[in-house]
């Protein structure tokens, strides 16, 4: 009954707001743009408004109280008669919300924590930037246009990857990324924690992973692969720090997807424990941005014992459904010559198929074995699209990065997929077609408009659309060594990706988006202290 009354009230108010008036604004400036917006006449003065929570959870009440503190902080504690009232409505999706903005009262509806969180994120974008900084300007305009907003995301997975192996970023720097993700309603932080260039997660059973594998003897300079700055480089996160980040992210509606890349991209582990490799070493962490030939020896049972021990600790720290196991860029040259791996191939009866080698099927075996182990822990596997090569077992989720074809193939074969094609979603690529204007990095050109124009369901049959879980942008840090550089590459392109993730195609408009970013969102980014590319077109 309450749900029906809510929908009737929303419809009635929308009709009222649609009445013609001279002062109606064209856009609310919100990114990502909501599913349905009806802008009316007049405005609500939010300065000093009383913020009320009715029937919300304790965690949601904390969110609402936080908004109330921001609104009243600059008003000398004087609370006006105008109200912003938050309440629950049955039947709404967990990430759905609705906002009715009248001249004296705002009603906010949701059914769960994330819906309330996103409603607040939207309201804050309608207010002066003081709500992000806490530094108040008496001349700021706190008037919010009267409107009805009904909103929910298009995709469940709205992700962003940060590579902390190639370059290490301190906890506070990671949290600053989580903060800006929350502003734009991203909800999955893919944390790339291990690679050939450094192991970043404390594993208590294998302390050398961070003591040895967490540090490399220098880093190449620019594009010169023969160069080395000679500076010992590294760092790692303790499990206590990681748990703190998990809690911090959860408050912002973000789940963390940790990645332990295997069986390739493992030189940091091999350097610490050489017996895990096919040759026995010695190994050393890579100092150049390249793909290592050395990978885990999967003919040895000790390698699987290592994998299971590591993933057990990963599951203890990260409580969410998905664990990313990499699976990308795995050269087979060591396996081809390794007696242990060849014995495993013979034991399993693996054969070349003409399309795939026995070593490809050996990697399928690794994926399936790890998948089965994680299933025993109540977890699911995500892997890069290379895990499709050969004979993938049901239940894995594909992350399509080498273009869109991996996601299309996955969906057509009944696998879930997350779309992150490099030509649209790799934000370590240049924002300009003139690399000399950009920091040193990969020369591929991915401007804001290209990010914004990506349609993740193109090429996917309609009856397979449900297999596309969402979209993710990635920042790989081979050439990105500072927090400011990460932010510059991320912003404002992440805002464009956020509309791909959240907004339906019919609700997207690049001209509107560009104006909203230039006129309002840059002000938010600046107020929060982010470095960003100030021109979204060159």
Q: Residues of each region from the PLM?
A:
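Bacterial Sec-dependent N-terminal signal peptides
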Residues: 1-29
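Acidic, contiguous N-terminal accessory segments
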Residues: 21-156, 375-388, 392, 519-538
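Feature activates predominantly on carbohydrate-active enzymes
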Residues: 22, 93-304, 308-322, 338, ...
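Soluble non-cytosolic domains of exported or imported proteins
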Residues: 58-62, 113-118, 168-172, 236, ...
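Flexible loop/turn segments at secondary-structure boundaries
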Residues: 60, 168-170, 196-202, 263-269, ...
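Active-site neighborhood of glycoside hydrolase catalytic domains
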Residues: 269-275, 286-394, 401-409
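Flexible, acidic glycine-rich loops studded with aromatic residues
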Residues: 380-396, 401-538
């Amino acid at each position: 009954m309450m749900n029906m009354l809510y929908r009737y009230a929303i419809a009635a108010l929308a009709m009222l707001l649609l009445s013609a008036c001279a002062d109606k604004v064209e856009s609310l400036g919100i990114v990502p743009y909501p599913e349905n917006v009806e802008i009316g006449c007049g405005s609500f003065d939010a300065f000093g408004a009383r913020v009320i929570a009715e029937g919300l959870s304790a965690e949601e009440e904390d969110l609402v109280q936080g908004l109330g503190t921001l609104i009243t902080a600059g008003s000398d504690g004087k609370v006006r008669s105008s109200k912003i009232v938050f309440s629950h409505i049955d039947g709404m999706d967990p990430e759905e919300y609705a906002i009715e903005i009248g001249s004296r009262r705002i009603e906010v509806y949701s059914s769960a924590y994330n819906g309330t969180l996103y409603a607040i994120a939207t309201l804050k974008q309608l207010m002066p930037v003081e709500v992000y900084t806490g530094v108040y300007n008496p001349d700021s305009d706190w008037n919010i246009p009267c409107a009805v907003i009904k909103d929910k995301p298009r995709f469940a997975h709205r992700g962003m990857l940060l590579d902390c192996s190639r370059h290490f970023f301190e906890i506070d720097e990671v949290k600053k990324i989580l903060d800006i993700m929350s502003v734009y309603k991203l909800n999955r932080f893919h944390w790339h924690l291990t690679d050939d260039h450094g192991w970043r997660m404390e594993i208590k059973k294998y302390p050398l992973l961070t003591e040895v594998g967490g540090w490399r003897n220098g880093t190449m300079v620019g594009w010169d692969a023969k160069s080395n700055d000679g500076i010992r480089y590294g760092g790692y996160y303790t499990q206590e720090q990681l748990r703190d980040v998990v809690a911090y992210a959860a408050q912002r509606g973000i789940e963390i997807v940790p990645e332990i890349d295997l069986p390739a991209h493992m030189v940091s582990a091999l350097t610490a424990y050489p017996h895990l490799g096919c040759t026995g070493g010695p190994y050393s962490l890579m100092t150049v941005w390249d793909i290592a030939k050395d990978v885990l020896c999967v003919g040895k049972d000790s390698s699987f014992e290592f994998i299971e021990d590591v993933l057990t600790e990963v599951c203890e720290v990260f409580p969410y459904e998905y664990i990313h196991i990499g699976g990308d860029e795995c050269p087979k040259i060591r396996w081809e010559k390794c007696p242990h791996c060849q014995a495993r191939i013979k034991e399993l009866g693996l054969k070349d198929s003409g399309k795939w080698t026995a070593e490809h099927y050996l990697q399928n075996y690794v994926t399936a074995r790890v998948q089965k182990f994680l299933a025993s822990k109540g977890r699911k596997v995500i892997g890069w699209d290379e895990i499709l090569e050969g004979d993938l077992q049901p239940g894995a989720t594909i992350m399509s990065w080498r273009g869109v074809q991996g996601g299309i193939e996955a969906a057509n074969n009944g696998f879930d997929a997350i779309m992150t094609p490099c030509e649209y979603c790799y934000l370590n690529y240049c924002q300009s077609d003139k690399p000399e204007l950009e920091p040193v990095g990969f020369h591929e050109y991915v401007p804001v408009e290209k990010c914004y124009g990506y349609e993740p369901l193109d090429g996917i049959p309609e009856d397979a659309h449900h297999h596309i879980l969402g979209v993710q942008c990635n920042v790989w840090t081979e050439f990105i060594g500072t927090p400011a550089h990460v932010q510059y590459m991320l912003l404002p392109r992440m805002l464009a990706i956020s509309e791909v993730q959240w907004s339906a195609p019919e609700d997207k408009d690049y001209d509107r988006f560009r104006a909203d970013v230039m006129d309002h969102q840059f002000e938010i980014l600046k107020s929060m202290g982010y470095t960003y590319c100030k021109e979204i077109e060159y």
